[in-house]
Amino acid sequence: MSVSDKDFKDIELLPVKSIESKDSIDQCDPLTWPIRIRIINTIIISFMTMLCMYGSSVFMPSIPELCEKFGEPETLVVLGATLYVIGVMLGPLIFSPLSELYGRRPLNIFGYTLFALMQIPTALSVNLAMFVVFRFFSGFFGSVGLGIGAGSLSDMFSKRDRGKYIGIYFLGICLGPAIAPIASGFIAGSSISWRWEFWILLMLSGVSLLAGVVFLKETYAPVLKRKQAKKLLEKQENQKSVEVKISEITESSQQIDPDKSFAEVVHILVTTIRRPLHLLCTQPIMILISLIVGTVYGILYLLFTAFAEVWISQYHFTSGLSGLTYISLSIGQVFAVFVLLPLNQKYWLSAVQKNNGVPEPEFRLPMAFLGCFAIMTGMFIFGWTVQYKVFWFVPLIGTTLVGAGFVMTFNPMNMFIVDNYGRYAASAMAAIAIPRNIFGACFPLFAEKLFERLGYGWGSSLLAFLLVAINFSIAALYMFGKTIREKRPFDHTKY
């Protein structure tokens, strides 16, 4: 069952002598925290998540060197990226629901510690098998930010303010895979070993982990309220009365309690971990959003895989210069976050006002429609200008549009999920991560064959035509989403 504020209202009515003050109650509600604390939490979570996504494409420019080092073909070396993305897909299935039992902070610190440690054996890999195995575990543990991040931000910000701060978080998701090849491209084109790509990632993740240990706070209200209730139990004179309230809180929030039997604990854990799969398999809204987000994500990763080869073969760039071309994607993403998403927030506020102050998740979606169109346009420009070797600056205009369009599509879709599923946003985000990362893992596998057989022009056009169907899906979600949600609501009492 879900936990509402009314589950705790009786606690405030108990005779309190020493700890019931307005300040102590506010500590249980992250929405009331000082904005400085919430922004610090947002920055740390966003940076951790960015580094996880940074890791997904960090070795792309060094693929030729790895092929030579391990004596394996490119199709097998690319498994280092594929298995990483699969790890990123599976991690949120565990971390997200567990964060709704144990809280966000301990899982963030645990997962990110292991993510940092996984860079050591990856950098020391002596063969391809060792490399891809530790790449998988690196993605699995690093995905904790992807699974919990959106939920943490929804804990701290109201629907009115949520858009701009979650926009910063999603900027980290988008920038990570785009900026990694920039640094790695120069490493690949120099005498420095490819291993330094992972040593640098270890250093960066160590810094962010230290910041998390020092500054990151717990944001999940049921966990905070449970801790507050335990303080009451310790300090109140009327022990029996308070114990009753503690029991009610534990039962209603499904928190793991030391007094529960092992079988009860296992039941709660299994039920909670099943929640993302239940959402994905039974919610039509989730299925539709999964297809939309997965397709866009897959196209972006396909582009990451093809980028280095395009600039080297068609324009004879060095590895370092080809890495710099990823900046165009980053420029588009930054522009979308700081210019276009605020416009979408203004539209959302206007739509809420016209709807008598009632916010609907569908109000987030118009920007996604425009974003998908921007990706389509960018793919056409990129593909055909590269095909005919037009001046290199022109295809970069196309990739800038792709970068902006990705944020414009990805952010509203995830905001829709956060708005619709509220306290269970972390589980819903974990559900979306499954198809999203399957697409992200599979699309790069056929990138080489796609452009080899169709050429860059028609290959990119095929992907753009696929996005036409995606745009129709976004339009359908906007028009009929509310009806679908009302007919098939999520019954959180079962999960």
UniProtKB/Swiss-Prot annotation:
GO molecular function: copper ion transmembrane transporter activity; transmembrane transporter activity
Any one GO biological process: copper ion import across prospore membrane
Pfam families in UniProt: MFS_1
Domain of life: Eukaryota
Listed name of the protein: Uncharacterized transporter mfc1
UniProt keyword terms in alphabetical order: Membrane, Transmembrane, Transmembrane helix, Transport
Family as reported in the entry's similarity comment: Belongs to the major facilitator superfamily. CAR1 family.
Gene name linked to the record: mfc1
Protein localization: Membrane
Knockout or disruption consequences: Lead to sensitivity to camptothecin and DNA damaging agents.
Membrane topology: Multi-pass membrane protein
Ranges that cross the membrane: 43-63, 75-95, 106-126, 128-148, 168-188, 196-216, 284-304, 323-343, 366-386, 390-410, 426-446, 461-481
The keyword Transmembrane appears for this protein: yes
Cited SUPFAM superfamilies: MFS general substrate transporter
Lineage, uppermost ranks: Eukaryota, Fungi, Dikarya, Ascomycota, Taphrinomycotina
Cross-referenced InterPro entries: MFS, MFS_dom, MFS_trans_sf
Organism: Schizosaccharomyces pombe (strain 972 / ATCC 24843) (Fission yeast)
Primary site of residence: membrane
GO cellular component, one term: prospore membrane
Record PROSITE patterns: MFS (PS50850)
